[in-house]
Amino acid sequence: MARGAENSKDIATSKIGAKAVRVEVIETMPSFEGLEQDWNAVYDADPDAQLFLSFKWLAGWLKWVSGPWFVLAARASDVAEAPYVAFLPMRISVKTSDIPFHNELNMAGNFAADYTGILCRPGFEHQAIPAFARHLKQMNWARLNLENIRMSETRYRLLMAHFPKANFAISQVSLVGKVDGIDNALCPFATLPPDWNAYLDGLSANTRQKIRRLLKQFEASDEYRITVATPETIDRDLDTLLRFWEIKWTPRKGNLVPAMIRSNRGMLTRSFKSDLLYLPTLWRGDRPLAALATLIDRRKRSFLFYMTGRDETFDGPPPGVILHAHSIRYAIENGFTEYDFLRGNETYKYSFGVKERSIRHTVIGTKNGRNIGGRLDSRTVPAALKEATELHKVGKLPQAERGYRQILEVDPQNADAIHRLGQLLTATGNHAAARKQFKTLTTIRPEVFKAWLCLAQSCEALGQHLEAARAYRQVVKLQPNVPDGFNGLGRMLHKLNRIEEFDAAMELVLEDERQVTERNGRAPDRRKVAAAPASVLSH
Protein backbone atom coordinates (compact mmCIF):
# COMPACT_ATOMS: atom_id res chain seq x y z
CA MET A 1 0.00 0.00 0.00
CA ALA A 2 1.45 3.37 -1.01
CA ARG A 3 0.34 6.20 1.25
CA GLY A 4 -0.13 9.56 -0.44
CA ALA A 5 -0.37 8.15 -3.95
CA GLU A 6 -1.64 10.28 -6.82
CA ASN A 7 -5.11 11.82 -6.29
CA SER A 8 -5.06 10.74 -2.64
CA LYS A 9 -5.51 7.09 -3.57
CA ASP A 10 -3.93 4.22 -1.70
CA ILE A 11 -3.83 1.07 -3.78
CA ALA A 12 -3.91 -2.57 -2.78
CA THR A 13 -4.54 -5.75 -4.71
CA SER A 14 -6.65 -8.50 -3.20
CA LYS A 15 -6.55 -11.92 -4.83
CA ILE A 16 -9.26 -14.57 -4.68
CA GLY A 17 -8.08 -17.69 -6.43
CA ALA A 18 -7.06 -16.60 -9.90
CA LYS A 19 -9.07 -13.40 -9.65
CA ALA A 20 -8.00 -10.11 -8.16
CA VAL A 21 -9.63 -6.78 -7.42
CA ARG A 22 -7.84 -3.51 -7.02
CA VAL A 23 -8.81 -1.51 -3.91
CA GLU A 24 -8.19 2.22 -3.92
CA VAL A 25 -8.66 4.65 -1.05
CA ILE A 26 -10.33 7.95 -1.91
CA GLU A 27 -9.80 10.66 0.71
CA THR A 28 -10.42 14.07 -0.89
CA MET A 29 -13.49 15.74 -2.38
CA PRO A 30 -11.87 16.30 -5.80
CA SER A 31 -11.05 12.58 -6.02
CA PHE A 32 -14.53 11.66 -4.80
CA GLU A 33 -16.21 14.01 -7.26
CA GLY A 34 -14.24 12.38 -10.04
CA LEU A 35 -16.06 9.13 -9.27
CA GLU A 36 -19.56 10.46 -10.02
CA GLN A 37 -20.12 8.69 -13.32
CA ASP A 38 -18.66 5.38 -12.09
CA TRP A 39 -20.53 5.67 -8.79
CA ASN A 40 -23.86 6.21 -10.52
CA ALA A 41 -23.26 3.23 -12.80
CA VAL A 42 -22.67 0.92 -9.83
CA TYR A 43 -25.58 2.50 -7.93
CA ASP A 44 -28.01 1.93 -10.78
CA ALA A 45 -26.93 -1.71 -11.13
CA ASP A 46 -27.07 -2.54 -7.41
CA PRO A 47 -30.48 -3.81 -6.21
CA ASP A 48 -29.47 -3.02 -2.59
CA ALA A 49 -28.60 0.61 -3.34
CA GLN A 50 -30.53 3.30 -1.49
CA LEU A 51 -30.53 7.07 -1.29
CA PHE A 52 -28.05 7.41 1.58
CA LEU A 53 -25.46 5.68 -0.62
CA SER A 54 -26.27 7.82 -3.65
CA PHE A 55 -23.58 10.08 -5.02
CA LYS A 56 -25.68 13.24 -4.69
CA TRP A 57 -26.57 12.67 -1.05
CA LEU A 58 -23.09 11.58 0.02
CA ALA A 59 -21.36 14.42 -1.82
CA GLY A 60 -23.39 16.95 0.14
CA TRP A 61 -22.89 15.12 3.42
CA LEU A 62 -19.13 14.58 3.10
CA LYS A 63 -18.54 18.26 2.37
CA TRP A 64 -20.21 19.11 5.66
CA VAL A 65 -18.92 16.50 8.10
CA SER A 66 -16.00 17.28 10.35
CA GLY A 67 -13.15 14.84 10.65
CA PRO A 68 -11.57 12.50 8.12
CA TRP A 69 -13.50 10.18 5.85
CA PHE A 70 -12.51 7.77 3.11
CA VAL A 71 -14.04 5.59 0.43
CA LEU A 72 -12.77 2.12 -0.41
CA ALA A 73 -13.25 1.75 -4.16
CA ALA A 74 -12.83 -1.65 -5.83
CA ARG A 75 -12.00 -2.11 -9.50
CA ALA A 76 -12.94 -5.29 -11.33
CA SER A 77 -9.30 -6.39 -11.66
CA ASP A 78 -5.80 -5.28 -10.72
CA VAL A 79 -5.59 -3.33 -13.97
CA ALA A 80 -5.57 0.39 -13.22
CA GLU A 81 -8.17 1.18 -15.89
CA ALA A 82 -10.57 -1.61 -14.91
CA PRO A 83 -14.11 -0.40 -14.13
CA TYR A 84 -15.19 0.22 -10.56
CA VAL A 85 -17.49 -2.43 -9.17
CA ALA A 86 -17.94 -1.57 -5.48
CA PHE A 87 -17.68 1.28 -2.98
CA LEU A 88 -17.55 1.41 0.82
CA PRO A 89 -17.75 4.96 2.28
CA MET A 90 -16.54 5.36 5.87
CA ARG A 91 -15.47 7.88 8.51
CA ILE A 92 -12.74 7.55 11.11
CA SER A 93 -12.54 9.24 14.50
CA VAL A 94 -10.40 9.17 17.61
CA LYS A 95 -11.80 8.26 21.01
CA THR A 96 -10.23 9.32 24.28
CA SER A 97 -12.58 7.87 26.86
CA ASP A 98 -10.09 5.08 27.47
CA ILE A 99 -6.33 5.05 27.70
CA PRO A 100 -4.69 4.63 25.30
CA PHE A 101 -6.45 6.69 22.65
CA HIS A 102 -7.99 4.54 19.94
CA ASN A 103 -9.70 4.91 16.58
CA GLU A 104 -13.23 4.02 15.57
CA LEU A 105 -14.57 3.43 12.09
CA ASN A 106 -18.14 4.43 11.27
CA MET A 107 -20.19 4.22 8.13
CA ALA A 108 -19.85 7.52 6.30
CA GLY A 109 -23.55 8.39 6.46
CA ASN A 110 -23.77 8.19 10.23
CA PHE A 111 -25.26 10.15 11.92
CA ALA A 112 -27.75 11.46 9.40
CA ALA A 113 -28.41 8.36 7.29
CA ASP A 114 -31.15 5.96 8.29
CA TYR A 115 -29.46 3.32 6.14
CA THR A 116 -25.81 2.55 5.44
CA GLY A 117 -24.08 -0.22 3.54
CA ILE A 118 -21.88 -1.19 0.62
CA LEU A 119 -22.49 -0.47 -3.05
CA CYS A 120 -21.62 -3.41 -5.28
CA ARG A 121 -22.33 -4.40 -8.84
CA PRO A 122 -24.11 -7.80 -8.90
CA GLY A 123 -21.72 -10.66 -9.53
CA PHE A 124 -18.76 -9.00 -7.80
CA GLU A 125 -19.81 -9.44 -4.16
CA HIS A 126 -17.52 -12.44 -3.60
CA GLN A 127 -14.52 -10.48 -4.83
CA ALA A 128 -15.09 -6.94 -3.60
CA ILE A 129 -16.54 -7.41 -0.12
CA PRO A 130 -13.79 -9.77 1.15
CA ALA A 131 -11.24 -7.38 -0.38
CA PHE A 132 -12.76 -4.52 1.59
CA ALA A 133 -12.66 -6.60 4.77
CA ARG A 134 -9.00 -7.47 4.30
CA HIS A 135 -8.17 -3.84 3.69
CA LEU A 136 -9.99 -2.77 6.85
CA LYS A 137 -8.00 -5.29 8.88
CA GLN A 138 -4.78 -3.63 7.74
CA MET A 139 -5.87 -0.29 9.16
CA ASN A 140 -5.44 1.08 12.68
CA TRP A 141 -8.69 0.89 14.65
CA ALA A 142 -10.13 -0.68 17.77
CA ARG A 143 -13.83 -0.51 16.95
CA LEU A 144 -15.76 -0.84 13.69
CA ASN A 145 -19.39 0.31 13.91
CA LEU A 146 -21.62 -1.17 11.24
CA GLU A 147 -24.56 1.00 12.25
CA ASN A 148 -27.88 0.97 10.39
CA ILE A 149 -26.49 -1.54 7.92
CA ARG A 150 -28.99 -2.41 5.21
CA MET A 151 -27.65 -5.19 3.03
CA SER A 152 -28.53 -8.68 1.93
CA GLU A 153 -27.73 -11.60 4.19
CA THR A 154 -25.25 -12.86 1.59
CA ARG A 155 -23.29 -9.61 1.62
CA TYR A 156 -23.39 -9.37 5.39
CA ARG A 157 -22.00 -12.89 5.79
CA LEU A 158 -19.26 -12.23 3.24
CA LEU A 159 -18.14 -9.25 5.29
CA MET A 160 -18.43 -10.84 8.73
CA ALA A 161 -16.59 -14.00 7.67
CA HIS A 162 -13.38 -11.99 7.88
CA PHE A 163 -13.98 -10.97 11.49
CA PRO A 164 -14.27 -14.29 13.36
CA LYS A 165 -15.25 -14.26 17.02
CA ALA A 166 -12.01 -16.04 17.86
CA ASN A 167 -10.10 -12.91 16.87
CA PHE A 168 -12.59 -10.08 17.37
CA ALA A 169 -15.22 -9.05 19.90
CA ILE A 170 -18.54 -9.09 18.02
CA SER A 171 -21.73 -7.63 19.43
CA GLN A 172 -25.18 -6.69 18.18
CA VAL A 173 -26.64 -3.40 19.41
CA SER A 174 -30.35 -3.37 20.17
CA LEU A 175 -32.21 -0.72 18.20
CA VAL A 176 -35.30 -0.81 20.42
CA GLY A 177 -35.99 2.51 22.12
CA LYS A 178 -35.81 2.27 25.90
CA VAL A 179 -38.53 4.88 26.43
CA ASP A 180 -41.05 4.23 23.67
CA GLY A 181 -40.26 0.60 22.80
CA ILE A 182 -40.04 1.43 19.09
CA ASP A 183 -37.92 -1.08 17.19
CA ASN A 184 -35.74 0.98 14.88
CA ALA A 185 -34.37 -2.15 13.24
CA LEU A 186 -37.73 -2.54 11.49
CA CYS A 187 -38.30 -0.29 8.50
CA PRO A 188 -41.79 -0.29 6.96
CA PHE A 189 -42.17 0.57 3.28
CA ALA A 190 -45.02 0.62 0.79
CA THR A 191 -44.67 -0.65 -2.77
CA LEU A 192 -46.48 1.83 -4.99
CA PRO A 193 -48.57 0.76 -7.99
CA PRO A 194 -48.81 3.04 -11.01
CA ASP A 195 -52.31 4.22 -10.05
CA TRP A 196 -53.50 6.08 -6.93
CA ASN A 197 -56.80 4.24 -6.75
CA ALA A 198 -54.98 0.93 -7.08
CA TYR A 199 -52.87 1.93 -4.09
CA LEU A 200 -55.96 2.81 -2.05
CA ASP A 201 -57.55 -0.51 -2.97
CA GLY A 202 -54.68 -2.25 -1.22
CA LEU A 203 -55.44 -0.57 2.11
CA SER A 204 -57.98 -1.58 4.71
CA ALA A 205 -61.49 -0.33 4.09
CA ASN A 206 -61.34 2.01 7.08
CA THR A 207 -58.02 3.57 6.05
CA ARG A 208 -59.09 3.87 2.41
CA GLN A 209 -62.29 5.69 3.36
CA LYS A 210 -60.48 7.91 5.87
CA ILE A 211 -57.86 9.04 3.35
CA ARG A 212 -60.43 9.73 0.64
CA ARG A 213 -62.62 11.68 3.05
CA LEU A 214 -59.76 13.78 4.43
CA LEU A 215 -58.28 14.66 1.05
CA LYS A 216 -61.69 15.54 -0.35
CA GLN A 217 -62.47 17.67 2.69
CA PHE A 218 -59.23 19.61 2.48
CA GLU A 219 -59.23 20.06 -1.27
CA ALA A 220 -62.79 21.39 -1.25
CA SER A 221 -62.06 23.82 1.58
CA ASP A 222 -60.92 27.42 1.25
CA GLU A 223 -59.72 27.24 4.85
CA TYR A 224 -56.98 24.63 4.39
CA ARG A 225 -54.19 24.45 1.85
CA ILE A 226 -50.95 22.58 1.17
CA THR A 227 -47.86 24.34 -0.13
CA VAL A 228 -44.65 22.71 -1.34
CA ALA A 229 -41.25 24.25 -0.60
CA THR A 230 -39.67 26.35 -3.33
CA PRO A 231 -36.35 28.21 -3.39
CA GLU A 232 -38.22 31.25 -2.11
CA THR A 233 -39.93 29.43 0.79
CA ILE A 234 -37.48 26.69 1.80
CA ASP A 235 -36.06 28.59 4.77
CA ARG A 236 -39.52 29.41 6.08
CA ASP A 237 -40.75 25.85 5.60
CA LEU A 238 -37.71 24.35 7.31
CA ASP A 239 -38.22 26.77 10.19
CA THR A 240 -41.80 25.52 10.53
CA LEU A 241 -40.80 21.87 10.40
CA LEU A 242 -37.93 22.16 12.85
CA ARG A 243 -39.79 24.41 15.28
CA PHE A 244 -42.60 21.88 15.61
CA TRP A 245 -40.09 19.04 15.86
CA GLU A 246 -38.14 20.85 18.58
CA ILE A 247 -41.25 21.43 20.69
CA LYS A 248 -42.15 17.76 20.58
CA TRP A 249 -38.73 16.23 21.17
CA THR A 250 -37.02 18.59 23.60
CA PRO A 251 -38.64 16.99 26.68
CA ARG A 252 -37.22 13.60 25.66
CA LYS A 253 -33.91 14.46 24.00
CA GLY A 254 -33.01 17.52 26.07
CA ASN A 255 -29.61 19.07 25.37
CA LEU A 256 -29.13 17.00 22.22
CA VAL A 257 -31.88 18.88 20.39
CA PRO A 258 -29.93 22.01 19.27
CA ALA A 259 -27.20 19.93 17.63
CA MET A 260 -29.78 17.65 16.01
CA ILE A 261 -31.65 20.64 14.61
CA ARG A 262 -28.45 22.12 13.15
CA SER A 263 -27.56 18.79 11.57
CA ASN A 264 -31.04 18.21 10.16
CA ARG A 265 -31.31 21.74 8.84
CA GLY A 266 -27.98 21.44 7.10
CA MET A 267 -28.72 18.04 5.59
CA LEU A 268 -32.22 19.02 4.42
CA THR A 269 -31.00 22.32 2.97
CA ARG A 270 -28.27 20.56 0.99
CA SER A 271 -30.76 17.92 -0.12
CA PHE A 272 -33.15 20.60 -1.37
CA LYS A 273 -30.39 22.28 -3.36
CA SER A 274 -29.57 18.89 -4.90
CA ASP A 275 -33.22 18.24 -5.84
CA LEU A 276 -33.50 15.49 -3.23
CA LEU A 277 -36.20 16.96 -0.98
CA TYR A 278 -40.00 17.16 -1.15
CA LEU A 279 -41.35 19.33 1.68
CA PRO A 280 -45.12 20.00 1.82
CA THR A 281 -46.62 22.16 4.57
CA LEU A 282 -50.27 22.05 5.67
CA TRP A 283 -51.88 25.39 6.51
CA ARG A 284 -55.12 26.63 8.02
CA GLY A 285 -55.32 30.16 6.73
CA ASP A 286 -51.98 31.70 7.63
CA ARG A 287 -51.35 29.21 10.43
CA PRO A 288 -48.96 26.34 9.61
CA LEU A 289 -50.22 23.07 11.06
CA ALA A 290 -47.58 20.55 9.99
CA ALA A 291 -44.68 19.94 7.61
CA LEU A 292 -43.29 16.67 6.29
CA ALA A 293 -39.79 16.21 4.85
CA THR A 294 -39.34 13.40 2.35
CA LEU A 295 -36.10 12.60 0.55
CA ILE A 296 -36.35 11.79 -3.15
CA ASP A 297 -34.33 9.08 -4.88
CA ARG A 298 -35.03 9.64 -8.57
CA ARG A 299 -32.60 6.95 -9.67
CA LYS A 300 -34.34 4.22 -7.65
CA ARG A 301 -37.80 5.85 -7.93
CA SER A 302 -38.24 5.98 -4.17
CA PHE A 303 -39.66 8.45 -1.64
CA LEU A 304 -38.10 8.24 1.83
CA PHE A 305 -40.03 9.88 4.67
CA TYR A 306 -37.38 11.51 6.85
CA MET A 307 -39.06 13.64 9.52
CA THR A 308 -42.20 15.56 10.36
CA GLY A 309 -43.35 18.21 12.79
CA ARG A 310 -46.82 19.40 13.65
CA ASP A 311 -48.60 21.90 15.84
CA GLU A 312 -49.47 19.80 18.87
CA THR A 313 -52.10 22.35 19.93
CA PHE A 314 -54.19 21.86 16.78
CA ASP A 315 -57.35 19.94 17.60
CA GLY A 316 -58.64 18.92 14.21
CA PRO A 317 -58.21 16.40 11.40
CA PRO A 318 -54.84 14.57 11.62
CA PRO A 319 -52.26 16.60 9.67
CA GLY A 320 -49.82 13.68 9.51
CA VAL A 321 -52.26 11.40 7.70
CA ILE A 322 -53.12 14.17 5.27
CA LEU A 323 -49.50 14.98 4.42
CA HIS A 324 -48.49 11.33 4.05
CA ALA A 325 -51.47 10.67 1.77
CA HIS A 326 -50.68 13.79 -0.23
CA SER A 327 -47.02 12.76 -0.59
CA ILE A 328 -47.83 9.17 -1.56
CA ARG A 329 -50.28 10.34 -4.21
CA TYR A 330 -47.72 12.80 -5.55
CA ALA A 331 -45.11 10.03 -5.67
CA ILE A 332 -47.43 7.72 -7.61
CA GLU A 333 -48.41 10.46 -10.05
CA ASN A 334 -44.72 11.08 -10.75
CA GLY A 335 -43.77 7.46 -11.37
CA PHE A 336 -42.19 6.53 -8.04
CA THR A 337 -42.50 2.90 -6.99
CA GLU A 338 -41.74 2.93 -3.25
CA TYR A 339 -42.63 5.01 -0.21
CA ASP A 340 -40.17 4.20 2.56
CA PHE A 341 -41.06 5.13 6.14
CA LEU A 342 -37.43 4.45 7.18
CA ARG A 343 -36.55 3.34 10.70
CA GLY A 344 -39.10 2.53 13.36
CA ASN A 345 -42.18 0.34 13.64
CA GLU A 346 -44.57 3.05 14.84
CA THR A 347 -48.14 1.81 14.63
CA TYR A 348 -49.45 4.52 12.30
CA LYS A 349 -47.08 3.45 9.51
CA TYR A 350 -48.80 0.11 9.17
CA SER A 351 -52.08 1.69 8.08
CA PHE A 352 -50.44 2.67 4.77
CA GLY A 353 -50.16 -0.86 3.37
CA VAL A 354 -46.54 -1.54 4.19
CA LYS A 355 -44.15 -4.44 4.32
CA GLU A 356 -41.00 -4.58 6.45
CA ARG A 357 -37.31 -4.72 5.87
CA SER A 358 -34.74 -4.83 8.65
CA ILE A 359 -31.40 -3.25 9.40
CA ARG A 360 -28.83 -4.01 12.07
CA HIS A 361 -26.09 -2.44 14.14
CA THR A 362 -23.08 -4.71 14.50
CA VAL A 363 -19.99 -3.69 16.44
CA ILE A 364 -16.64 -5.31 15.67
CA GLY A 365 -13.95 -4.64 18.25
CA THR A 366 -10.43 -5.77 18.95
CA LYS A 367 -10.10 -8.19 21.85
CA ASN A 368 -7.85 -5.89 23.89
CA GLY A 369 -9.62 -2.65 23.05
CA ARG A 370 -6.49 -1.25 21.41
CA ASN A 371 -5.88 -0.28 17.82
CA ILE A 372 -4.84 -2.91 15.33
CA GLY A 373 -1.13 -2.32 14.81
CA GLY A 374 -0.83 -0.50 18.13
CA ARG A 375 -0.79 2.96 16.53
CA LEU A 376 -3.23 5.77 15.87
CA ASP A 377 -4.46 6.29 12.34
CA SER A 378 -2.41 9.20 11.01
CA ARG A 379 -5.53 10.86 9.58
CA THR A 380 -6.81 11.43 13.11
CA VAL A 381 -3.70 13.12 14.51
CA PRO A 382 -5.31 16.61 14.45
CA ALA A 383 -8.33 15.34 16.37
CA ALA A 384 -6.13 13.41 18.80
CA LEU A 385 -4.05 16.51 19.44
CA LYS A 386 -7.17 18.53 20.15
CA GLU A 387 -8.44 15.92 22.61
CA ALA A 388 -5.07 15.57 24.34
CA THR A 389 -4.87 19.33 24.68
CA GLU A 390 -8.33 19.46 26.28
CA LEU A 391 -7.30 16.76 28.75
CA HIS A 392 -4.17 18.77 29.48
CA LYS A 393 -6.20 21.93 30.13
CA VAL A 394 -8.50 20.23 32.65
CA GLY A 395 -5.59 18.70 34.54
CA LYS A 396 -5.85 15.09 33.37
CA LEU A 397 -2.12 14.97 32.85
CA PRO A 398 -1.45 11.20 32.62
CA GLN A 399 -4.13 10.84 29.94
CA ALA A 400 -2.89 13.89 28.08
CA GLU A 401 0.72 12.69 28.20
CA ARG A 402 -0.26 9.32 26.80
CA GLY A 403 -2.16 11.06 24.02
CA TYR A 404 0.78 13.27 23.08
CA ARG A 405 3.12 10.28 23.02
CA GLN A 406 0.72 8.28 20.83
CA ILE A 407 0.64 11.18 18.39
CA LEU A 408 4.43 11.30 18.30
CA GLU A 409 4.60 7.57 17.60
CA VAL A 410 2.78 8.32 14.34
CA ASP A 411 4.10 11.81 13.64
CA PRO A 412 7.49 12.30 15.38
CA GLN A 413 7.89 15.79 13.91
CA ASN A 414 4.56 17.12 15.17
CA ALA A 415 5.75 20.39 16.69
CA ASP A 416 2.54 21.14 18.58
CA ALA A 417 2.52 17.74 20.28
CA ILE A 418 6.21 18.09 21.16
CA HIS A 419 5.67 21.57 22.59
CA ARG A 420 2.65 20.61 24.68
CA LEU A 421 4.26 17.42 25.93
CA GLY A 422 7.26 19.47 26.99
CA GLN A 423 4.99 21.90 28.82
CA LEU A 424 3.24 19.02 30.57
CA LEU A 425 6.54 17.48 31.64
CA THR A 426 7.69 20.83 32.95
CA ALA A 427 4.50 21.17 34.99
CA THR A 428 5.12 17.77 36.57
CA GLY A 429 8.73 18.67 37.39
CA ASN A 430 10.34 16.34 34.87
CA HIS A 431 12.68 18.96 33.47
CA ALA A 432 15.14 16.50 31.94
CA ALA A 433 12.41 14.93 29.79
CA ALA A 434 11.01 18.37 29.00
CA ARG A 435 14.45 19.57 27.91
CA LYS A 436 14.67 16.69 25.46
CA GLN A 437 11.34 17.65 23.90
CA PHE A 438 12.22 21.32 23.63
CA LYS A 439 15.64 20.51 22.18
CA THR A 440 13.88 18.57 19.44
CA LEU A 441 11.44 21.43 18.96
CA THR A 442 14.26 23.91 18.27
CA THR A 443 15.45 21.70 15.41
CA ILE A 444 11.95 21.61 13.91
CA ARG A 445 11.09 25.28 14.49
CA PRO A 446 14.43 27.07 14.86
CA GLU A 447 12.83 30.36 13.84
CA VAL A 448 10.26 30.33 16.67
CA PHE A 449 11.46 32.09 19.81
CA LYS A 450 9.10 30.17 22.13
CA ALA A 451 10.90 26.91 21.35
CA TRP A 452 14.19 28.45 22.48
CA LEU A 453 12.58 30.06 25.52
CA CYS A 454 11.16 26.72 26.67
CA LEU A 455 14.54 25.05 26.13
CA ALA A 456 16.28 27.83 28.05
CA GLN A 457 13.91 27.55 30.99
CA SER A 458 14.30 23.76 31.14
CA CYS A 459 18.07 24.04 31.08
CA GLU A 460 17.94 26.69 33.78
CA ALA A 461 15.76 24.44 35.96
CA LEU A 462 18.38 21.70 35.55
CA GLY A 463 21.23 24.06 36.46
CA GLN A 464 22.65 23.89 32.93
CA HIS A 465 23.47 27.59 32.88
CA LEU A 466 25.73 27.73 29.85
CA GLU A 467 23.26 25.93 27.61
CA ALA A 468 20.44 28.01 29.07
CA ALA A 469 22.36 31.20 28.27
CA ARG A 470 22.88 30.09 24.68
CA ALA A 471 19.14 29.39 24.34
CA TYR A 472 18.18 32.70 25.95
CA ARG A 473 20.53 34.42 23.53
CA GLN A 474 18.53 32.90 20.65
CA VAL A 475 15.34 34.22 22.22
CA VAL A 476 16.76 37.74 22.34
CA LYS A 477 18.03 37.40 18.80
CA LEU A 478 14.64 36.27 17.46
CA GLN A 479 12.40 38.40 19.68
CA PRO A 480 14.39 41.14 21.41
CA ASN A 481 11.37 42.75 23.05
CA VAL A 482 10.43 39.68 25.09
CA PRO A 483 11.48 40.45 28.68
CA ASP A 484 11.88 36.78 29.63
CA GLY A 485 14.62 36.31 27.07
CA PHE A 486 16.57 39.39 28.00
CA ASN A 487 16.20 38.84 31.73
CA GLY A 488 17.02 35.15 31.45
CA LEU A 489 20.19 35.88 29.53
CA GLY A 490 21.27 38.32 32.22
CA ARG A 491 20.49 35.79 34.95
CA MET A 492 22.56 33.09 33.30
CA LEU A 493 25.52 35.38 32.71
CA HIS A 494 25.37 36.29 36.37
CA LYS A 495 25.32 32.58 37.30
CA LEU A 496 28.34 32.10 35.06
CA ASN A 497 30.13 35.00 36.79
CA ARG A 498 30.31 36.93 33.53
CA ILE A 499 28.08 39.81 34.45
CA GLU A 500 30.87 42.32 33.79
CA GLU A 501 31.03 41.23 30.18
CA PHE A 502 27.27 41.50 29.94
CA ASP A 503 27.29 44.98 31.48
CA ALA A 504 30.04 46.10 29.15
CA ALA A 505 28.21 44.80 26.13
CA MET A 506 25.00 46.38 27.32
CA GLU A 507 26.68 49.74 27.82
CA LEU A 508 28.11 49.64 24.30
CA VAL A 509 24.71 48.85 22.86
CA LEU A 510 22.90 51.51 24.88
CA GLU A 511 25.47 54.19 24.05
CA ASP A 512 25.23 53.39 20.37
CA GLU A 513 21.45 53.41 20.52
CA ARG A 514 21.33 56.67 22.47
CA GLN A 515 23.15 58.31 19.61
CA VAL A 516 20.76 56.79 17.09
CA THR A 517 17.77 57.84 19.17
CA GLU A 518 18.95 61.42 19.23
CA ARG A 519 19.05 61.37 15.43
CA ASN A 520 15.77 59.64 14.58
CA GLY A 521 13.93 58.81 17.80
CA ARG A 522 14.30 55.01 17.62
CA ALA A 523 14.38 52.94 20.81
CA PRO A 524 17.46 50.88 21.77
CA ASP A 525 17.64 47.55 19.96
CA ARG A 526 18.18 44.68 22.39
CA ARG A 527 18.96 42.41 19.46
CA LYS A 528 22.52 43.77 19.62
CA VAL A 529 22.89 42.50 23.16
CA ALA A 530 22.61 39.01 21.78
CA ALA A 531 24.91 39.67 18.88
CA ALA A 532 27.61 41.94 20.31
CA PRO A 533 29.30 39.84 23.01
CA ALA A 534 29.53 36.59 21.06
CA SER A 535 32.69 35.65 22.91
CA VAL A 536 30.82 35.61 26.19
CA LEU A 537 29.10 32.31 25.33
CA SER A 538 31.86 30.72 23.35
CA HIS A 539 33.10 28.45 26.11
Short names for language-model regions:
Residues 2-21, 91, 159-197, 338-386, ...:
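Active-site/acyl-donor-binding loops of N-acyltransferases
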Residues 22-105, 148-315:
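A conserved beta-strand-loop-helix scaffold within acyl/acetyltransferase catalytic domains
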Residues 381, 415-416, 431, 449-450, ...:
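Helix-start (N-cap) detector for alpha-helical repeat units in TPR-like alpha-solenoids
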Residues 393, 427-428, 461-462, 495:
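Register position in tetratricopeptide repeats
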